[in-house]
C-alpha cells in the first residue's frame, strides 16, 4: 500500500512540476504582450521607470499565471523528489521559447529547435529514471535528517562559501566575473529548495489535522526560506544587470540544479537506494537538458534555419559545377589553341618548302 501511495504521489508531483513550467513559461509571453501593447500606445516603458503596466490586463494575467506556476512548483516538492522537480524547471524556458516564436514573432532558429528537442528528451529520461518513492513524510523525520552529521558538515561549508563570496570575493570581482553572483544564488538556492520541501511536508500534515503550527521547525523553515529567496533575488538581479541574459540563464540553471541535486543526495538520500542504471540515466538526462539549454540561449541571435542547409549545399554544388565548367572551357581553349598552333606551324613549313621549290 505504501509503495502504491509513493508512486501515486510521484505522478502527482510530476504533473504539478510540468504544469508549473507551462504556467511560468506562458507568464513571460503574457507579460511581454502587455508591455508591447503599452509601447504601441506610447506609454512610458517599464525600463524607463513607468508603471503603466499596472493598468494592463495582459500583464496582470501574466502575473497571475506566474503565481499559479510558483504555487504548483511549491506543491510539487511535497509529492515528488527534488531530484525530479528542480531539473524540470528547464521546461519553462522551453515553453517560453516556443510560445514566443508563435505569439511574439520571435524567430526560433535551428539551434533553438534542436535545444528544445534535447530538453524534452532529457526531461523524459529524468522522469523515467528519477526515484519514485519519497522517504520523508513528517516534520519529525525532516528534523532528524537536518541533524544528520553529513548534512551539518555540508550546510556549514555552504554557509562559509556563501559568506566569503558575499563579503570578500563579491565586492572585488563581482562586476567582472559572472560566476561570483551566480554561485551565491546557486549555493543559497540549495537551502531554499530544502526549505520548500520541508514546508510542503508541513502543509500536507496541516491538512491531515496535525498540530504543525506548534512545531518550531515549520517557522524556522519559513524564516530560512524568506532569507534565502531574498538573497537569491538580490544577487541574480545583479548578475542579470551586469551580464548578458543569454549567458546568465544557462549557467545559473546548471549551477543551481547541481547544488540542489547535491543537497538532495546528502539530506534526503534520494540516490541511496537507486540502481546504478537509474543514477546514470538521471545524470544523462540532466546533462542532455544542459546541452539543450545551451543551444537554445547561446545561438539565439544566429540567423540559421533548416532551409539554410540545402541552399548552402546547392551553392556548393553550383560552385563545383562552375569550377568544372571553367576547367572544361580552359581545356577546350588550350586544345583549340594547340591545334591552331600546330596547323599554323605546319602551314608555315609547307609554304617554306613551296617557296624553296619555286626558287629552285
Swiss-Prot record:
The processes (GO biological process) annotated in the record are: magnesium ion transport
User: Would I find Membrane among this entry's keywords?
Assistant: yes
Query: Which parts of the sequence lie on the Cytoplasmic side of the lipid bilayer?
Result: 31-56, 100-107, 171-175, 237-246, 300-360
The primary site where this protein sits is membrane
Looking at the keywords, is Metal-binding present? no
Q: Which residues lie on this side of the membrane: Extracellular?
A: 1-9, 78, 129-149, 197-215, 268-278
Bilayer-spanning residue ranges: 10-30, 57-77, 79-99, 108-128, 150-170, 176-196, 216-236, 247-267, 279-299
Under catalytic activity, the entry for this protein gives: Mg(2+)(in) = Mg(2+)(out)
Q: In which tissues is it expressed?
A: Widely expressed.
Report the GO molecular function annotations.
Answer: magnesium ion transmembrane transporter activity
PANTHER family given in the database record? MAGNESIUM TRANSPORTER NIPA2, PTHR12570
User: What is the name of the protein in this document?
Assistant: Magnesium transporter NIPA2
Q: Which organism is it from?
A: Homo sapiens
Phylogenetic lineage: Eukaryota, Metazoa, Chordata, Craniata, Vertebrata
Q: Which gene encodes it?
A: NIPA2
Amino acid at each position: 500500500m505504501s509503495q502504491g501511495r509513493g508512486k501515486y504521489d510521484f505522478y502527482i508531483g510530476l504533473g504539478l512540476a510540468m504544469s508549473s513550467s507551462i504556467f511560468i513559461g506562458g507568464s513571460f509571453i503574457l507579460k511581454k504582450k502587455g508591455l508591447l501593447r503599452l509601447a504601441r500606445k506610447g506609454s512610458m516603458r517599464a525600463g524607463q521607470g513607468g508603471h503603466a503596466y499596472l493598468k494592463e490586463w495582459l500583464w496582470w494575467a501574466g502575473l497571475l499565471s506566474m503565481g499559479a506556476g510558483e504555487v504548483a512548483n511549491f506543491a510539487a516538492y511535497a509529492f515528488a523528489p527534488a531530484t525530479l522537480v528542480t531539473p524540470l524547471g528547464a521546461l519553462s524556458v522551453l515553453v517560453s521559447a516556443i510560445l514566443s516564436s508563435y505569439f511574439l514573432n520571435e524567430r526560433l532558429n535551428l539551434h533553438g529547435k534542436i535545444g528544445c528537442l534535447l530538453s524534452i528528451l532529457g526531461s523524459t529520461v529524468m522522469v523515467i529514471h528519477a526515484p519514485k518513492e519519497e522517504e520523508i513524510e513528517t516534520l519529525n523525520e525532516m528534523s532528524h535528517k537536518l541533524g544528520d552529521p553529513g548534512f551539518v558538515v555540508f550546510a556549514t561549508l555552504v554557509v562559509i562559501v556563501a559568506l566569503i563570496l558575499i563579503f570578500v570575493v563579491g565586492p572585488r570581482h563581482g562586476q567582472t566575473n559572472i560566476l561570483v553572483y551566480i554561485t551565491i544564488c546557486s549555493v543559497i538556492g540549495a537551502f531554499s529548495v530544502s526549505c520548500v520541501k520541508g514546508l510542503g511536508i508541513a502543509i500536507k500534515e496541516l491538512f491531515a489535522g496535525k498540530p504543525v503550527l506548534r512545531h518550531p521547525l515549520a517557522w524556522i523553515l519559513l524564516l530560512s526560506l524568506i532569507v534565502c529567496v531574498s538573497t537569491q533575488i538580490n544577487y541574480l538581479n545583479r548578475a542579470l544587470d551586469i551580464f548578458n541574459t543569454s549567458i546568465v540563464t544557462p549557467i545559473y540553471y546548471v549551477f543551481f540544479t547541481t547544488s540542489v541535486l547535491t543537497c538532495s543526495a546528502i539530506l534526503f538520500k534520494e540516490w541511496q537506494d537507486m540502481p546504478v542504471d537509474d543514477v546514470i540515466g538521471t545524470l544523462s538526462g540532466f546533462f542532455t537538458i544542459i546541452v539543450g539549454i545551451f543551444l537554445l540561449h547561446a545561438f539565439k541571435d544566429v540567423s540559421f534555419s533548416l532551409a539554410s542547409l540545402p541552399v548552402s549545399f546547392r551553392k556548393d554544388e553550383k560552385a563545383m559545377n562552375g569550377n568544372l565548367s571553367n576547367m572544361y572551357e580552359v581545356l577546350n581553349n588550350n586544345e583549340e589553341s594547340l591545334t591552331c598552333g600546330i596547323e599554323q606551324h605546319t602551314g608555315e613549313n609547307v609554304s617554306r618548302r613551296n617557296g624553296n621549290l619555286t626558287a629552285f
